[in-house]
Amino acid sequence: MAGYKKQHTDGPNSEDKAVVHFGGGCTGEIISAEGLVLTNHHCGYGAIQQHSSVDHDYLTNGFWAMNRNEELPCKGLTVTFIDRILDVTTYVNEQLKKDDDPNGINYLSPKYLATVADRFAKAENIQITPATRLELKPFYGGNKYYLFVKTVYNDIRMVGAPPSSIGKFGADTDNCCLLYTSDAADERS
C-alpha cells in the first residue's frame, strides 16, 4: 500500500498490527516494512483477473513485479487496519437513555450507532483523517459496545501471484481438505 505507515497501538511488536482486512472479506498479513501484504490466491483472484488479458494471462502464467514500477494498481481493492478497539459501552448506554426511539431498537441500528460513533470520536478528540473509518458494533445482544477505529488504504498494487495451476492446485476438494495449494498472492499497500 502506498503511504503505509507502521501502526503502534498496543506496543511496537504487537502481532495483531500485522493482520489486515483484505478486500471484501479476506485477511492478509503485512510481511515487510514497505507494506507488502501476503494473502490467499483466491482473495487476490479478482485483482489478478483485472489485469489479465490475452497478451498477459496472469491467471494462467502468474505475475511477478521485479521492481515497484512494474506493480499493477488494483482498482477498488482496499486493505484495512484495525488501529484500536475501544469499549464504549458506558458512552453508548448514556446516549441510548437520551434516545427518543419509540420502538427502543436503535441499540442495534447501524445508522444510529454510526452517529453515536461520530459523537464519541468528537468528544474524545479521536484524530480522523480521510482514511479513518469508525465502526461501532453491539456485542452480546447489545450488552457491550465496541468502537473499531480503522485505517483504510486504497492504493493497492499487485506485486505477485503464482499461476492458477499452483494457486488452485488440487481444486476445492483437495485444497479445502488437505491444503496442497500455494494459495497465495502478494500486494503492496
Regions found by a protein language model. Give the residues of each.
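Start-of-domain marker
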Residues: 1-13
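A conserved glycine-rich beta-strand in the N-terminal activation segment of trypsin-fold
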Residues: 17-34
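Short, flexible loop/turn elements at secondary-structure junctions
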Residues: 24, 43, 160-162
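Catalytic-histidine neighborhood of serine endopeptidases
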Residues: 38-82
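Gly/Pro-rich turn-and-neighbor structural signature
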Residues: 113-178
